[in-house]
């Protein structure tokens, strides 16, 4: 009988299934040599050997984890002495460490002017154990939320900026990601694409009025203010 090692992560989440775990059975206690039998769990995590075993000591090892779970490397031993043997095992569910990194929409990780990538507050939401979990994190000067958001179940995750850093506009978008154990390249650590979380710097205009030093306003004689160029540095 197989169960989840952390049901709060897997309960009600279709990204996890107890079906499809495959085990090899070996003669002796060390799970070595040629397997004498193989069995696969059903949706309830239950499996039975296809035929009875003779009395003796046997070992079992998982060779394929079910969807959403980590492979269990442990070797389990049991003995047959004329009675049925029951074996209870658990698999650890896979989870994500979510790294949020923000960038300037034009310059990348270099803030413009007096703006700063530090101080942006992000809200991460996801479903776990029948509840909506909401967590918050604040960016550092490189635009990173540290530490990363850890122990997030596979599934739908939303990320939203709720406070912009100094000198930048608030990003009102709700960014939604669906991350499953079947996504190519998904490991325990998942970094959100920085291009999704860019900041637009707040810009202001400049008005210049040139005046005559003597009259205080209009030019003298045939002089003219027209065509004068200014450099803004």
Q: Model features per residue range: what roles?
A:
Residues 1-233:
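Solvent-exposed loop/turn and edge beta-strand elements of beta-rich ligand-binding domains
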């Amino acid at each position: 009988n197989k169960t989840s090692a952390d049901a709060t992560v897997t309960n009600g989440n279709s990204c996890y299934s107890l079906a499809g775990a495959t085990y090899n059975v070996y003669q002796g206690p060390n799970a070595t040599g040629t397997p004498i039998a193989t069995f696969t769990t059903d949706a309830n995590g239950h499996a039975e050997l296809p035929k009875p075993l003779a009395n003796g000591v046997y070992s079992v090892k998982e060779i394929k984890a079910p969807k959403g779970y980590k492979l269990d490397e442990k070797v389990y031993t049991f003995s047959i002495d004329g009675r049925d043997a029951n074996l209870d095992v658990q698999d650890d569910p896979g989870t994500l460490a979510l790294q949020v990194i923000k960038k300037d929409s034009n310059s990348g990780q270099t803030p413009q002017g007096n703006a700063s990538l530090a101080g942006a507050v992000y809200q991460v939401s996801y479903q776990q154990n029948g509840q909506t979990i909401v967590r918050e994190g604040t960016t550092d000067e490189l635009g990173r939320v540290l530490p990363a958001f850890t122990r997030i179940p596979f599934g739908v995750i939303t990320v939203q900026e709720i406070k912009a850093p100094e000198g930048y506009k608030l990003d009102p978008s709700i960014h939604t990601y669906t991350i499953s154990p079947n996504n190519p390249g998904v490991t325990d650590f998942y970094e959100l694409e920085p291009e999704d979380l860019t900041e637009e710097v707040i810009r202001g205009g400049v008005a210049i009025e040139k005046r005559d030093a003597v009259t205080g306003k209009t030019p003298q004689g045939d002089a003219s203010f027209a065509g004068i160029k200014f450099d803004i540095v």
